[in-house]
């Protein structure tokens, strides 16, 4: 008799659990359908706004080209000044449109991420208790760590005069400032050469043999890229690129700071004279 009562209790408990899971499943499906149905409309609205901004941006670029062509052909100084101001306003407008496009794309990305996160939270209701507990612990650990922002930073607005010089590239008032493209290329080269020098200037990372010969002005072992002095009697012979301020091997002859004359392509006269005397003997 007792066994039958226990079985009935188990059956009723199982029925309650099944009913609860069915209710949760029904809620999940309903939320999922609402999310899936509304997401395309929200994305389409953002895409439409993005397309409108892009059309305005293309029109502004065309306006910039037209005004710049007129500026190059204009001889009157007053008219050139008016065209320059017109060009300046168009450049500012183009940058603002670009910033708005970036903001719309960021909103679209956040919209998709929020919907995915919402569905993931709902799906945890159907996991086993042990799995649900592990997922909860994992989410707590993730929340305790510094959160990485997925938001793309807005581009900083530069000054109007720098924007103008960046696009016109030949206007009288901005001739002393190099074009942005050239500045960016120069900055990239400097960054690459600096990183390369930092890598070459750190021989500590290598396992150094105490009996290994040393070179260069720094009296360190051979590592990284090195260049040889063209003076046959040079006491040091080899030099690290970073120690002699080189980023690439120069063409022709090269002399180290101890052996060079007026420049790195010529040898010191006193050193050359001593060399000739030795040959005469």
From Swiss-Prot:
Its main location: nucleus. Signal peptide: none annotated. It is found in: Nucleus. A zinc finger (PHD-type) spans 213-262. One of its GO terms (biological process) is male germ-line stem cell asymmetric division. Residues 123-204, 261-281 are annotated as: Disordered. The keyword Electron transport does not apply. It holds the Pfam family ING. Keywords: Chromatin regulator, Coiled coil, Growth regulation, Isopeptide bond, Metal-binding, Nucleus, Transcription, Transcription regulation, Ubl conjugation, Zinc, Zinc-finger. Zn(2+) 1 binds at residues 216, 218, 240, 243. Residues 182-194 have a biased composition (Basic residues). One of its GO terms (cellular component) is nucleus. Zn(2+) 2 binds at residues 229, 234, 256, 259. One of its GO terms (molecular function) is histone reader activity. Residues 49-101 form a coiled coil. Residues 131-141, 261-275 have a biased composition (Basic and acidic residues). The record marks 215, 226, 230, 238 as: Histone H3K4me3 binding. Interacts with H3K4me3 and to a lesser extent with H3K4me2. Component of a mSin3A-like complex at least consisting of SIN3A, HDAC1, HDAC2, RBBP4/RbAp48, RBBP7/RbAp46, SAP30 and ING2. The PHD-type zinc finger mediates the binding to H3K4me3. The polybasic region (PBR) is responsive to the binding to phosphoinositides (PtdInsPs), including phosphatidylinositol 5-phosphate (PtdIns(5)P). Seems to be involved in p53/TP53 activation and p53/TP53-dependent apoptotic pathways, probably by enhancing acetylation of p53/TP53. Component of a mSin3A-like corepressor complex, which is probably involved in deacetylation of nucleosomal histones. ING2 activity seems to be modulated by binding to phosphoinositides (PtdInsPs). This is Inhibitor of growth protein 2. The lineage of its organism: Eukaryota, Metazoa, Chordata, Craniata, Vertebrata. The gene is Ing2.
């Amino acid at each position: 008799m007792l066994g039958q009562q226990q079985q009935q209790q188990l059956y009723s408990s199982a029925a309650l659990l099944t009913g609860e899971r069915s209710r949760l499943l029904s809620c999940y499906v309903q939320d999922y359908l609402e999310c899936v149905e509304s997401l395309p409309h929200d994305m389409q609205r953002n895409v439409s706004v993005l397309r409108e901004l892009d059309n305005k941006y293309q029109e502004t670029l065309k306006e910039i080209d037209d005004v710049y062509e007129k500026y190059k052909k204009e001889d009157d100084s007053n008219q050139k000044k008016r065209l320059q101001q017109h060009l300046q306003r168009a450049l500012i407008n183009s940058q603002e449109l670009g910033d708005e496009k970036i903001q719309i794309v960021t909103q679209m990305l956040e919209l998709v991420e929020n919907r995915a996160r919402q569905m993931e939270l709902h799906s945890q209701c159907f996991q086993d208790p042990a799995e649900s507990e592990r997922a909860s612990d994992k989410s707590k650990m993730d929340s305790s760590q510094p959160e990485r922002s997925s938001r793309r930073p807005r581009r900083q607005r530069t000054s109007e005069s720098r924007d103008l010089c960046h696009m016109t590239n030949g206007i009288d008032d901005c001739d002393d400032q190099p074009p942005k493209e050239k500045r960016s290329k120069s900055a990239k080269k400097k960054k690459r050469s600096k990183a390369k020098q930092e890598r070459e200037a750190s021989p500590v990372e290598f396992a150094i043999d105490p009996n290994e010969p040393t070179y260069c002005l720094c009296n360190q072992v051979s590592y990284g890229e090195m260049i040889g002095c063209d003076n046959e009697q040079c006491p040091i012979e080899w030099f690290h690129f970073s120690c002699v301020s080189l980023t690439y091997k120069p063409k022709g002859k090269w002399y180290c700071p101890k052996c060079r004359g007026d420049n790195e392509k010529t040898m010191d006269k006193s050193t050359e004279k001593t060399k000739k005397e030795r040959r005469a003997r």
